[in-house]
Amino acid sequence: MSPNSLPAATHEELGDELSAVRMSDMMALVRGGGRLAATRGERLRTLIMLGRPRTCVPGLLAFALGFSYTAGAPLARTALGATLALSIGFSANLHNVATDLYEDSRNLPGRVTLLAKIGARPLIVLCRSLSALMMAGAVALGAYFALFMGLAVVGLHQYSSPPVRSKGRPILGLWVFAQAVVFPFLFGWTTAPGRMLETLLAAMTAPLRGAAPPPAAEAWTSWRYLAMWFFLTLWFMAKGTFKNVPDYDGDLAAGIRTSATLCKSRRSAARLAAALTVASYASLVPLVAFGLERPRVLVALAWLVPVTANGLRLVRAEDGPTSNAVLRADMVISSGFIATLLLLVAPRLESVAMVVLGAAILFGSDLLELDSRRDADARGPFAPDSGVQLRPPPRGM
């Protein structure tokens, strides 16, 4: 049966029988402004799945880590900062879904179905509304917070969108991806900025100005914060190389230059990602060697055992769906590592509370399947070259 002779149906007539639908027609439905029939409750659940709260946990813990270098702030101010730290990752995930339709049709076909329940245009409107709310919350926390939030909203949304579309620029793409934890780390500081920045600048410029440097204890906190910022950047850039491997086939087909598609094969990309990931964790050692962190933080490197094992699993993975399962495990490992690091850097009750909250989000999302990189999404419900054609949606839908 040729594609043009396939039976036609509306999405209402199909119900849940999406296995009969061609991927090309589902993509056309989304691009044409249509969407699948769904209740409000289903759309809300789908929205949360597309926002992928489990992937926002490292950002939340990075916020807590950044906040631990400050003198503290009132609970309401801290709670708002933490909420905004979670929101920036959630918003970026939603935006990427709206812009990565072609890649997702190859890498995560099930995600196209989820997008079709929301609709591409409504999702973009929602992303813009969420960005406006985040900026309003950032303004309430002061000029520093608002400045970095503005950069985060623009920068992270340019990961998949023109004119920059940094995901197609290998090094820049990894650096922008790393900002998913770096900006929350900066939000932690800017929730209660104190004089950390002024102290750091004074310490750096004192020899040039011929002036006395700030007190050593004050300067040490600022230098520690800067060193941890550098470590988190390297760590999450390496995680970006890991994340790119499961998307190898779709990104290659779309002509997107990533750290993975620059390699000759998926396995070569996996080897590179595994090596860089192990090296990034080990880069915590120089922070202790130069006296910028206490020796106890090296206990967090016990996570190198599961990190290495998971890297080997990535190298052995034969296809995208199998690699996606490895990537999901990597998120648990990454969250566990930064939670351990937080508790070692700042062994306080507030840190424990943030770790408990992060664990609840991570494991709650898994329990309730509130994610759009599940095995079902990687394998998808579609038959790419055969099936039922979708008739265009009625006007006004």
Task: Label each residue range with its predicted role.
Residues 2-397:
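Multi-pass alpha-helical membrane architecture of UbiA-family
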